[in-house]
């Protein structure tokens, strides 16, 4: 069905968050029109990690089984000291973990998640997808939202959901706060398994923590590839953005770590470079018939691997808020915001703190290692209950 005004809901952005939002609307029978600025379908990036909360959200969106077919189910997670190669922390994510949180922990190629969502969108007759359509101007009345794209086209909707990322045009129009450039740079690459060191081909996300830097690797696509994510504190004044990376630059930041993890930096044929950013959490991101979702609402650093996970949660919560509000957008958007602000702010701030833990040096490194080495898996599970224990039936609980 269309909205009571005979107009679709406009969604700015066709990434994971935008597609998930469209599916949430589709499951309510609400027509949606996705405005994606890219001329082609697809997601940049490489591997991502999906916690139990992400799988709960995928199930609620009707794509859980499809996503599971592409995922690699890991056996544990490890944090290693990149200087002396000792294991700092070990957390099993097998059967005990699954029983605790109701879903698995897995790694997956970002493009595979996007593809599953996009295929489901194409199968949903109430969703229209427009490429090469960049939001340029937004106006809101009591009855509708009007979007002008960068080619002068006009799109009228009953509501607008901004899913347009860290540098959201929708957020700029209604909030206008600055991006917080972290000074941390992330390099990402995918390496074929045949070229990856045999002793590091583990069925686990493994992080090597060094001073002001760390590396993460884990398998993708049935173990045929390995994802490599490398983070360091830049010596330069950075501006948020994505570019091609330089092997010389990335290797120059890891001279102080052990040879075993450092060898990984020589493997990729090419790198992509992200100068990362987040924003300060805000208490309001719904404005009448306009709301924000995913990175547009709560951009976060990568240290908790929750960017995609929280966007999926957002979409499900938005659908639940619409159900509880009889598809009346203004109260539904307020209810959705009320249910998400505190939780997502906690993730944003916790991700920053986890970056400090990963990159500890000097005495802080020694304290971190001593605190975590003797920690039992159950204590890690308890500490992560607030994050991984998210449930759809509690989505509207603030």
Language-model features, listed with the residues they occupy:
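Conserved N-terminal helical subregion
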Residues: 2-9, 26, 51-173, 177-192, ...
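Short helix-loop capping/hinge motifs at secondary-structure junctions, enriched
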Residues: 193-200, 237, 324
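Conserved mid-domain beta->alpha element of the FAD-binding
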Residues: 6, 10-39, 161-162, 187, ...
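Conserved N-terminal glycine-rich FAD pyrophosphate-binding loop of Rossmann-like flavoproteins
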Residues: 40-56
